[in-house]
């Protein structure tokens, strides 16, 4: 049975993948909690290398030397990128990577400096303010603009129990400003990469097209397409994986 490892985004937990996994009965699906999240809430990391080492340990424990695919959403996708293309560690039998709404990296020092200031400000808020207050503002960001008021409130309610100093620390450890620009490495990699993106997620649609990645558009969905259209998302995962294992 083919193994699929799922990585959630900032503020999420492994349970975010439940609906997707239910639609993939013919695969061995393993969703992991990232550091500072869920059952790994007390596990501290300070950078991408630490995060990739944690990921390598979890994968080794889950699949031994068996073949596996990585699926990562947003922050989880960025950690998957670092693990697959940069980390100084053994990746054993990684067969391919599916990214969902994950930024490949910033190109200029100016962009990185601006992003660090932005992430630092958010991190301070996560560390100092009430979860409800900071999450209400977090979900007002342009990437979530397609959400209705009710959907925003549901997300705030869902995320507030996992929200606090831990999220601020993770934001600083894995700020996009600290991530290498992987756009060229993804294009040149012999490892298959696929990019999943909701049709309403215009920012990441543009990013995927600019970087000439193999784009899979998820209809009726925005940034969090695996949550908003789980069934279609699962079907496309299956299609991508079968392309590789049964060419």
Swiss-Prot record:
One GO MF term: 2-succinyl-6-hydroxy-2,4-cyclohexadiene-1-carboxylate synthase activity
Pfam family, one: Abhydrolase_1
Domain of life per record: Bacteria
One Gene Ontology biological process: menaquinone biosynthetic process
UniProt keyword annotation of Ligase present: no
Ranges for domain AB hydrolase-1: 4-229
EC number(s) per entry: 4.2.99.20
Pathway(s) this gene product operates in, as recorded in its UniProt entry: Quinol/quinone metabolism; 1,4-dihydroxy-2-naphthoate biosynthesis; 1,4-dihydroxy-2-naphthoate from chorismate: step 3/7; Quinol/quinone metabolism; menaquinone biosynthesis
InterPro entries: AB_hydrolase_1, AB_hydrolase_fold, SHCHC_synthase_MenH
Catalytic activity of the protein: 5-enolpyruvoyl-6-hydroxy-2-succinyl-cyclohex-3-ene-1-carboxylate = (1R,6R)-6-hydroxy-2-succinyl-cyclohexa-2,4-diene-1-carboxylate + pyruvate
Subunit comment: Monomer.
Cited HAMAP family: MenH
Job of this protein: Catalyzes a proton abstraction reaction that results in 2,5-elimination of pyruvate from 2-succinyl-5-enolpyruvyl-6-hydroxy-3-cyclohexene-1-carboxylate (SEPHCHC) and the formation of 2-succinyl-6-hydroxy-2,4-cyclohexadiene-1-carboxylate (SHCHC).
Similarity comment text for this entry: Belongs to the AB hydrolase superfamily. MenH family.
Protein name (Swiss-Prot/TrEMBL): Putative 2-succinyl-6-hydroxy-2,4-cyclohexadiene-1-carboxylate synthase
Biological source species: Haemophilus influenzae (strain ATCC 51907 / DSM 11121 / KW20 / Rd)
Lineage, opening ranks: Bacteria, Pseudomonadati, Pseudomonadota, Gammaproteobacteria, Pasteurellales
